[in-house]
Structure formats: C-alpha cells, structure tokens
Amino acid sequence: MLSILDILEDTTVDGPGFRTAIYAAGCPNGCPGCHNPESWDINRGRWMSTDEILQKVLADNFADGTFSGGDPMYQPEGFTELARAIKRQSRKNIWCYTGYTFEALLRNPRQAKLLEYIDVLVDGKFQKDLRDEELYFRGSSNQRLIDVQASLKANETVSYYYNPGI
C-alpha cells in the first residue's frame, strides 16, 4: 500500500512527453518554497494498492510514468513494487523526483533497490534561492537530471541531457 496525494494523467511538466504522474504523500525535507507543501504529511494521502495505481498507469498506452510528491523515496518498498510491475508489464520509462541525492540513495539499500527500475532521477532538495524557471523539469539549479541506468552500469553519476528539439 502506498499513501498517494494525487495521480495526474497526461501531464507534460513532470518529464518529457505525456506522463502519468503519481504524487506520493510524505516528505521529510520540508523545503522552503516547496510547490507542494500539502504533500509533506503522509497522512494527507489516500492509501492505494500498487495494483490500483498500476492500472491507472497502464491505462494510457502513450504516457510514461513519473513518481513525484512528496518524496517517493519516503515509501521505497511500495514504489519499488510499483516500478517493478510497470517495467514487467510495459515499455514505459519512469522518472522519479526526490529530495535525496543520488549518492545518498545508493547508500540506503531500501532506496537503492528502487533505482534499479528508474530511468531518470531528478535529485536534490528544492532550494528557493537557486530557483530557476528556465530549467527543464527542475525547480532549482542544484537539482540534477541523472540517467540512472547508465549511472548504475558505469558506477558513477551520468547526467541525463534533455533536448527539447527532438
């Protein structure tokens, strides 16, 4: 079971193309200026089974998936189960937003397991003083777009570069 604040279909701001965005409830960071402070409390969400969420993600053949929040890494086991099911039953790519850094996630076995199924990670806490509205898919310039699968293979952080012209 996962505590979910909202599920948005056909969003275009949480990664490239059309996406089904799953907004997790619960976040330990409490970043000043957060665009979604109601997501901090895990009890603000609705408890949903991974199967229930999976059906919503699979219902749109053309949309990929995004885990956001809140922080999906606050509920790593449930999101790992969901991501594994998405990958087994579709060819969708999965983006994940988190306030943790990639390096910190690798040190936590529960969170590192989820990375096995994530294609692109947007990492780092939102920092209001580094806010930049010109960035694609990030709120502040300290946040990184990371190609997770390439990073895991290379055993070093590999940036993901988004080219809006493609």
Question: What annotation goes with each model-predicted range?
Answer:
Residues 75-84, 90, 131-166:
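P-loop/Walker A phosphate-binding loop and immediately adjacent motor/lid segment at beta-alpha junctions
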Residues 13, 103, 130, 154:
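Flexible, glycine-rich phosphate/dinucleotide-binding loops
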Residues 8, 125, 149:
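Residues at the C-termini of beta-strands that transition into short coil/loop
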Residues 119:
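Receiver (REC) domain switch/active-site residues of two-component response regulators
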Residues 1-23, 32, 36-42, 157-158, ...:
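N-terminal [4Fe-4S]-dependent radical SAM core
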Residues 2-5, 18, 36-114:
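Conserved Radical SAM active-site core
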